[in-house]
A protein has these predicted regions:
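Hydrophobic ligand-binding cavity/cleft-lining segments
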Residues: 1-49
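Intrinsic-disorder/low-complexity, polar/charged segments enriched in Ser/Thr/Lys/Arg/Asp/Glu/Gln
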Residues: 2-8, 52, 66, 79, ...
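Hydrophobic pocket/interface hotspot
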Residues: 17-22, 28, 53-55, 71, ...
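Glycine-rich portal/gate segments that line the openings of hydrophobic small-molecule binding cavities
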Residues: 39-86, 143-146, 151-154
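Beta-strand/loop substructures that line and gate deep hydrophobic ligand-binding cavities in soluble
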Residues: 83-136
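A non-catalytic, amphipathic alpha-helix used as a structural packing/dimerization or gating element
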Residues: 136-144
């Protein structure tokens, strides 16, 4: 049974600027915490429905992870959805939604649907361990994204 995690943050940049930033997979290195190193990233370009993203990373310096994701939904400048098709989770779908605000700003909504496994043990691990990890990860990512938005406001 998948779980859902949601977090939102106001950004001092337009939905278009933030959509463009998040549609380029190479920008992931700008928002990842120092404990999560992206070692290799492969893609054929920016977000396009069906396009693949593959990356290898190390979490905490010693936990290797390989992810293969696909852009499932791309609706400029409001919605980007990527889904893991191979990797450490049974289910992992990440939606970015950019809600327009006055004065050229926006609110970024991140919703992650995830399951570590398909059994009740997997659900328990997801609810206790993964959810806590996502809180830490996205707090860092949103702080870095707010900083980036202030510096690249348009």
């Amino acid at each position: 049974m998948p779980s859902t995690f949601h977090v939102s943050t106001p950004l001092a940049a337009s939905p278009g600027v933030m959509f463009e930033f998040h549609s380029d997979p190479h920008n992931i290195v700008h928002v990842m915490p120092p404990s999560l190193k992206v070692l290799e990233l492969r893609t054929d370009g920016p977000a396009q429905e069906g396009r693949l993203i593959e990356f290898e990373c190390r979490d905490w310096g010693f936990i290797p992870m390989r992810w293969k994701c696909r852009w499932a939904r791309v609706e400029p400048p409001e919605v980007l959805v990527d889904e893991m098709i191979e990797g450490p989770f049974a289910t992992f779908v990440h939606e970015h939604r950019f809600e327009s605000l006055p004065a050229g700003e926006c609110i970024m909504h991140d919703t992650v649907t995830f399951a570590f496994g398909r059994s009740w043990w997997g659900w328990l691990i997801s609810e206790i361990g993964v959810r806590a990890y996502l809180h830490l990860l996205f707090a860092y990512r949103h702080a870095r994204t707010r900083k980036w938005a202030r510096e690249h406001r348009a």
